[in-house]
Regions:
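Bacterial N-terminal signal peptides that target proteins for export
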Residues: 2-13
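Bacterial N-terminal signal peptides
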Residues: 11-21
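Bacterial Sec-dependent N-terminal signal peptides
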Residues: 20-41
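Structural recognition of the beta-strand scaffold that forms the well-ordered cores
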Residues: 49-52, 89-90, 111-114, 136-139, ...
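Acidic glycine-/aspartate-rich tracts in secreted/extracellular proteins
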Residues: 54-59, 118-120, 143-144, 215-219, ...
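Protease zymogen maturation seam
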Residues: 97-112, 126-209, 217-223, 227-228, ...
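Substrate-binding/access-modulating region of protease and related hydrolase catalytic domains
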Residues: 200-206, 215, 223, 259, ...
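Extracellular calcium-associated, cysteine-rich motifs in secreted modular proteins
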Residues: 212, 219-220, 227-273
Length: 349
């Protein structure tokens, strides 16, 4: 593994381990943060907690019996029986060829615990925290969109810039935030990201993978087709985990929306407006005479960066996936950049 790739994975793993997230201009969130041990009942999932076992205390087995779950640890078995625990599984599923480094980071010690939803989350947190083998217990906060259902397009200016442009994509003339010469109405020259100068150095490389942790990407979009995908799976064998990451046929990424499947979700990406917009900003094909330009969309011939979809939202504002699992998935997929334009107000301690 390249050292840059390894450092990127470690960075994302540490972010996942500490369970932190930053807020962005497109926030999704919940109620104000609550004191530790007293999660808001409006934002914390009922009947579910996230625990981290101490080193060497992870259950060797979890067996379902008529009387409940059995782990081989008497104190733990008594506690989960008292709570009415119905399911317990790793937060981060077995990672195939990445399992060794997953364990080195201690991510294999995080477990989700499902219990009787009528029981108090606060009481369950305290009961599990008292167990000798438990390092910490956290609520699982719900993530909900607080913005509009759909983006509202701002009126386009009547005039567009007329100066020569680096690529022939028709929408580039209106992407003033890339390079602003002040010629458009109400424009301020230089209020941009200076992208045209950056393109003189590089317009992106298909050796670079960007994980888009957001709504699903429309991988068949005419300005994105060919720039979204996991090549090992795309050209691999159907029904086989060709890249050895623990996920089968994740050709375009993975849909992490909650389900009973394990690993959570499925390989069926559901296109979402915001996720597709974000992917286009990153990797829309440059120089194809279609749509807009991507910041790292290359110089034609799919020479720009590749993106993979780590889907955690749908157009249904009540659907959401597990963000920290999505982050790790992207890192294991070789992403050196994880794009996240979302956030929440409650954070993990």
């Amino acid at each position: 593994m390249h050292s840059f790739e390894k450092k990127s994975w470690l960075h994302i793993a540490l972010c996942a381990l500490s369970l932190l997230a930053a807020c962005a201009s497109d926030p999704i969130g919940e109620e104000a943060p609550q004191p530790v041990g007293e999660p808001s009942q409006e934002t914390a999932a009922t009947g579910r907690l996230r625990v981290k076992f101490k080193q060497g205390e992870v259950p060797e087995r979890i067996i379902e019996t008529r009387s409940g779950l059995q782990t081989g640890s008497e104190p733990l078995d008594r506690a989960i029986a008292a709570l009415g625990v119905t399911r317990m599984q790793r937060v981060f599923p077995p990672a195939g060829r990445f399992e060794a480094r997953t364990r080195r980071a201690g991510l294999d010690r995080w477990y989700d615990v499902w219990f009787d939803s009528l029981r108090s989350v606060t009481r369950a947190t305290l009961d599990l925290s008292r167990l000798e083998g438990i390092e910490c217990v956290e609520p699982v906060y719900a993530i909900r969109s607080i913005g509009p259902e759909r983006a509202v397009a701002a009126p386009l200016p009547a005039a567009t810039r007329t100066a020569s442009l680096p690529f022939d994509d028709p929408g580039l003339a209106k992407q003033w935030h890339y390079s602003n010469d002040g010629s458009m109405p109400d424009a301020v020259a230089g209020a941009d990201i200076n992208l045209f100068r950056a393109w003189e150095v590089t317009a992106g490389s298909n050796d670079v993978v960007v994980a888009v942790v957001d709504g699903g990407i429309d991988y068949a979009h005419e300005d994105l087709v060919g720039n979204v995908g996991n090549w090992a799976e795309l050209y691999g064998e159907e029904g086989v985990d060709d890249d050895g990451n623990g996920y089968v046929d994740d050709i375009y990424g993975w849909n992490f929306i909650y389900s009973s499947a394990y690993p959570m979700g499925s390989n069926r990406i559901t296109p979402v407006e915001h996720g597709t917009h974000v992917a286009g900003t990153i990797a829309a094909e440059n120089g194809n005479g279609i749509g807009v330009c991507g910041v790292a969309g290359g110089r034609g011939g799919h020479s720009g960066v590749r993106v993979i979809s780590c889907q955690m939202f749908t157009e249904n504002r009540n659907d959401n996936g597990d963000e920290i699992v999505a982050l790790k998935y992207g890192a294991d997929a070789g992403a050196v950049i994880s794009q996240n334009s979302w956030g929440y107000t409650n954070v993990y301690e």
